[in-house]
From Swiss-Prot:
Tissue spec: Seed specific.
Cofactor: Mg(2+)
Cofactor notes: Binds 2 magnesium ions per subunit.
Organism: Glycine max (Soybean)
Reported function: Kinase that can phosphorylate various inositol polyphosphate such as Ins(3,4,5,6)P4, Ins(3,4,6)P3 and Ins(1,3,4)P3. May participate in an inositol lipid-independent pathway of InsP6 synthesis.
Protein name, per record: Inositol-tetrakisphosphate 1-kinase 3
Enzyme Commission (EC) number: 2.7.1.134, 2.7.1.159
Keywords, in A-Z order: ATP-binding, Kinase, Magnesium, Metal-binding, Nucleotide-binding, Transferase
Amino acid sequence: MRLREEVACKNDDVCEKEEVVIENDVTVAQNHWCPVVNAGFSSPKRVVVVGYALTTKKIKSFLQPKLEGLARNKGILFVAIDHNRPLSDQGPFDIVLHKLSGKEWRQVLEDYRLSHPEVTVLDPPDAIQHLRNRQYMLQAVADMNLSDSYGIVGVPRQLVIKRDALAIPELVNKAGLTLPLVAKPLVADGSAKSHELSLAYEHFSLQNLEPPLVLQEFVNHGGVLFKVYIVGDAIKVVRRFSLPDVSKWELSKDAGIYRFPRVSCAAASADDADLDPTVAELPPRPLLEKLAKELRWRLGLRLFNLDIIREYGTRNHFYVIDINYFPGYGKMPEYEHIFTDFLLSLGQGKYKKK
């Protein structure tokens, strides 16, 4: 049930009018200065208003009923951003959550950030754009050169091919890359095509690939990868089945290019599978925390995930093979609690500064 009426604002003498909305027996009072929520507590709670601009597909996978219900109980209100109205005319928002593409939208967000510095934008458009090009995506990991007592984290050797497929075999030879090679589209825009992979077993077949693309040396990893979800300071790791290992015999016998769909997301979870313990063991928590903290700073992002593999036959040699902004959190266990806690911490931190 929804009610609208004018009431006096008890939180701030400056306020005169506010909108009262009753949803599922939870009273939400909204105005420009003092949004509050009263869910039967002795004192009202301040509402954290999250404006969201997401694709239809993302809304369906992310804004699930359980998330919205939990958010409402915690005093978080999700509000859809109207793309037909100026963003500055909407809100007020405490947080803007987005995953849309296009230069026009990026400019809208940049202008909004400049005119509304009090609003947390998740995440800065320029920082997100950095991950859309696989030529630069993994550079932050390579620059870290992370190595400590818990393990070593690197990236596979790779080569960027922007044009001229016929020249690929020669370029691969000059770069000294070792077969087999994984071919990925250069642009990582979240489309189905951007997640397609090809595995090339011999040099001659390389000229059948379609630039622009990135070639990465394939690292045997027991057919399992680790998806490391990062939400602010929180980290959650799940196992996924991946491409199977390639033996020397297979490399000598197989030819051509094998194409795969989106491997890690299409595959079933490997968490409950009967796996070799040396393959299934999760990366050390301290190593992941160090990696995530450093990447949050280097990338300027708070919502992303890493695809990590362990080199087969080793216990502590890891490779980051992909980074995705605002991934499919709906596949992350307990994402509703983790995400709402994160949004709440951002909102509370904002009000404490006032």
